[in-house]
A protein has these predicted regions:
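Compositionally biased intrinsically disordered regions enriched in Thr/Gly
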Residues: 1-214
Length: 214
């Protein structure tokens, strides 16, 4: 009996065209043409799991593209309401082996105030089922171990490049507390369309990466 053929994977970068409002207040009526990129995975044999992952990534990206394309570009069209939109989004593949694939999802949302919010999350998927998996557990850690590792890494970084404003303990506390906050929340703006199973962590070739806010 021949052993089953090992599935191999490749990745293609795809894009969607987006028409992004520049600023309804300072540049009414102006829009910017952008391309938002996301990965599409190809398997050497038919894979329901890969199809499921591709559908999840494409659907999530398409939802934001459609919302941004439909977003008003003049203040009068907003009817006096605060309208939050996604001005930029990029999903990139950071890791893939025979069992797991992981992506990094970066976006910039704004309600047209003094500044918007950059949010970076990660999402890992099982290549056997296509379902999201926790990057922390996939890396063999408990949440407590991951939080401790983040604290150690931040403290080590600040030992050579300290903050001008905050103590090392304060920075470590603030960053590690992010581990307890929903990863779909960035700088006070709730992301409407996060990937299911998103995390503050993602897997990369160098190891488990913790994504801080901007």
């Amino acid at each position: 009996v021949e052993a089953p053929e090992e599935i191999t994977y490749s990745v293609e970068t795809r894009s969607m065209d987006v028409s992004v409002p520049v600023d309804p207040y300072d540049a009414p009526g102006k829009r910017e043409a952008q391309k938002w990129y996301y990965p599409h995975i190809e398997a050497s044999t038919q894979s329901d799991a890969v199809d499921k992952i591709n559908a999840a990534l494409e659907e999530s990206m398409r939802t934001d593209v459609e919302k941004t394309n439909a977003a008003p570009d003049t203040a009068k069209d907003m009817g006096g309401a605060i309208v939050f939109i996604c001005q930029y989004r990029s999903i990139t593949l950071t890791y893939i082996d025979n069992d797991i694939v992981c992506v990094r999802d970066q976006r910039y949302d704004t309600g047209w105030g003094p500044h918007g919010s950059t949010t970076v999350t990660g999402c890992a998927y099982s290549l056997e089922t296509g379902d999201p998996v926790d990057p922390i557990s996939a890396f063999g850690l408990t949440p407590e171990q991951a939080q401790s590792a983040v604290a150690d890494a931040v403290a080590a970084y600040l030992a050579t490049d300290p903050s001008d404003l905050l103590s090392t303990n304060a920075v470590v506390r603030d960053i590690t507390n992010m581990c307890l906050i929903s990863p779909a929340t960035g700088s006070g703006i709730d992301v409407e369309n996060p990937l299911d199973g998103c995390s503050h962590f993602y897997i990369a070739s160098e190891g488990l990466v913790f994504a801080t806010e901007d």
